[in-house]
Amino acid sequence: MNMSVLTLQEYEFEKQFNENEAIQWMQENWKKSFLFSALYAAFIFGGRHLMNKRAKFELRKPLVLWSLTLAVFSIFGALRTGAYMLYILMTKGLKQSVCDQSFYNGPVSKFWAYAFVLSKAPELGDTIFIILRKQKLIFLHWYHHITVLLYSWYSYKDMVAGGGWFMTMNYGVHAVMYSYYALRAAGFRVSRKFAMFITLSQITQMLMGCVINYLVFNWMQHDNDQCYSHFQNIFWSSLMYLSYLLLFCHFFFEAYIGKVKKATKAE
């Protein structure tokens, strides 16, 4: 492949972004993610209690706008971080793409890495619509939101290896997922296979997360300076991704395979 095709061009706002200030801010403030998570949990239980006594809100137009905004953000994030990761993969190889800390402070990706971790706080707003519209709130939904927020803020401050893969995969899956949510909220009929594809993509993402953690753990044993992380981070990350993998597999079975079996028996 012609490497000139993969040459990265920065936009002005990406060039002007000061990653040192961003990393310093996160080092000083990452524990606020626990406060956000606590307020989020309080809203879930308090909101559900309050909504038991009143009719649901429709909120179709705000939901379309919300989902579309996150879809556009995720699409741009996926394109920019994806271009950077592809460039590193093609020019320096897999190990460098996993271990290199330049994803946090390099051209193009530095802005989108910080935007990613910050976005995990407003993304908690997804649940507001579920509560106010009195839809079913499953454990996977709020567990995933809380743990991603906590882990991303905790990891960004240390610029740990593997972050580029984690963030790029998440951007990509969210680009598809929020586009699907926007279409559904707007009243479009979307094939059930599309929803299945999204869940399978999430399962693949979690499986890849486990693989990346294994690679980081293996490579850091030989050269921690070139593949920087620490055991505590890998432990929490592995536990998180493994729990996601099991929960998404269970969700896939219950939502798609289990329903098909029940429908077949009913016939």
Swiss-Prot record:
The UniProt keyword set, sorted, is: Endoplasmic reticulum, Fatty acid biosynthesis, Fatty acid metabolism, Glycoprotein, Lipid biosynthesis, Lipid metabolism, Membrane, Transferase, Transmembrane, Transmembrane helix
> What pathway, per the record?
Lipid metabolism; fatty acid biosynthesis
Q: Which Pfam families match?
A: ELO
Q: Name one GO cellular component term.
A: endoplasmic reticulum
Q: Where are the transmembrane segments?
A: 34-51, 70-90, 111-131, 136-156, 159-179, 197-217, 234-254
* Gene Ontology MF, one: acyltransferase activity, transferring groups other than amino-acyl groups
Topologically, how does it sit relative to the membrane?
A: Multi-pass membrane protein
Specify the domain of life of the species encoding this protein: Eukaryota
Q: In which tissues is it expressed?
A: Expressed in liver and barely in brain.
Q: How is it modified after translation?
A: N-Glycosylated.
Question: PROSITE patterns of this UniProt entry?
Answer: ELO (PS01188)
Residues listed as glycosylation sites in the UniProt record:
N2
- Which locations, inside or outside the cell, does it occupy? Endoplasmic reticulum membrane
- Catalysed reaction, written as an equation: a very-long-chain acyl-CoA + malonyl-CoA + H(+) = a very-long-chain 3-oxoacyl-CoA + CO2 + CoA; hexadecanoyl-CoA + malonyl-CoA + H(+) = 3-oxooctadecanoyl-CoA + CO2 + CoA; (9Z)-hexadecenoyl-CoA + malonyl-CoA + H(+) = 3-oxo-(11Z)-octadecenoyl-CoA + CO2 + CoA; dodecanoyl-CoA + malonyl-CoA + H(+) = 3-oxotetradecanoyl-CoA + CO2 + CoA
List, in alphabetical order, the GO biological process terms annotated in this UniProt record.
Answer: fatty acid elongation; fatty acid elongation, monounsaturated fatty acid; fatty acid elongation, polyunsaturated fatty acid; fatty acid elongation, saturated fatty acid; long-chain fatty acid biosynthetic process; long-chain fatty-acyl-CoA biosynthetic process; positive regulation of cold-induced thermogenesis; sphingolipid biosynthetic process
Quote the InterPro entries the UniProt record gives.
ELO_CS, ELO_fam, ELOVL6
The job of this chain, per UniProt, is described as: Catalyzes the first and rate-limiting reaction of the four reactions that constitute the long-chain fatty acids elongation cycle. This endoplasmic reticulum-bound enzymatic process allows the addition of 2 carbons to the chain of long- and very long-chain fatty acids (VLCFAs) per cycle. Condensing enzyme that elongates fatty acids with 12, 14 and 16 carbons with higher activity toward C16:0 acyl-CoAs. Catalyzes the synthesis of unsaturated C16 long chain fatty acids and, to a lesser extent, C18:0 and those with low desaturation degree.
**Would you tell me the protein name for this molecule?**
Very long chain fatty acid elongase 6
Native organism is Rattus norvegicus (Rat)
The gene is Elovl6
